[in-house]
Amino acid sequence: MVHFTAEEKNAITTIWGKVNVEETGGEALGRLLVVYPWTQRFFDSFGNLSSASAILGNPKVKAHGKKVLTSFGDAVKNLDNLKGTFSKLSELHCDKLHVDPENFRLLGNVLVIVMAAHFNKEFTPEVQAAFQKLVTGVANALAHKYH
């Protein structure tokens, strides 16, 4: 179980309250698909993923990115129960979708990069550390059913 200090919780909730889920989600998922192209195999139904511009402009990538980040928002609301929060999604990704759990870690790292770009000076090293802890906790919660 991940334990967050009061300062970490405050940093996470303060920044998360400013996140544009649609924009940030689409960009994070898009970057994942560009930077780690083998992850595209899970998104065959998304159409044209042939180039960075095609991926970043793809409405299905943007829509799914929003869906992913909306789920991530559940983590922010349930910082003390990440495993429980992601139990059903872990089961879905393990049993039905067969997603390599390493992809959750990759997406978390990409999300931190995107947020750093969006929030610039507000995304201090302390805020980054709190979010890195959160994305690691979410990745572990999503990978829970794999063990």
Swiss-Prot record:
Q: Could you give one GO CC term from the UniProt record?
A: haptoglobin-hemoglobin complex
InterPro entries with a match to the protein in the record: Globin, Globin-like_sf, Globin/Proto, Hemoglobin_b, Hemoglobin_oxygen_transport
* MF annotations from Gene Ontology: haptoglobin binding; heme binding; metal ion binding; organic acid binding; oxygen binding; oxygen carrier activity; peroxidase activity
Question: Membrane-crossing residues?
Answer: none
User: Per the database record, which ranges form the Globin domain?
Assistant: 3-147
Q: Phosphoserine-modified residues are where?
A: S51
* Tissue/organ expression: Red blood cells.
Q: Which UniProt keywords apply?
A: Heme, Iron, Metal-binding, Oxygen transport, Phosphoprotein, Transport
- Specify which residues bind heme b according to the UniProt entry for this protein: H64, H93
Which SUPFAM superfamilies does this UniProt record tie to the protein? Globin-like
An example GO biological process term is: hydrogen peroxide catabolic process
* Biological function: The epsilon chain is a beta-type chain of early mammalian embryonic hemoglobin.
Known PANTHER family for this protein? HEMOGLOBIN FAMILY MEMBER, HEMOGLOBIN SUBUNIT EPSILON
Subunit structure and binding partners: Heterotetramer of two alpha chains and two epsilon chains in early embryonic hemoglobin Gower-2; two zeta chains and two epsilon chains in early embryonic hemoglobin Gower-1.
Similarity remark: Belongs to the globin family.
This chain's protein is named Hemoglobin subunit epsilon
- According to the entry, what is the taxonomic lineage of the organism? Eukaryota, Metazoa, Chordata, Craniata, Vertebrata
Gene name as annotated: HBE1
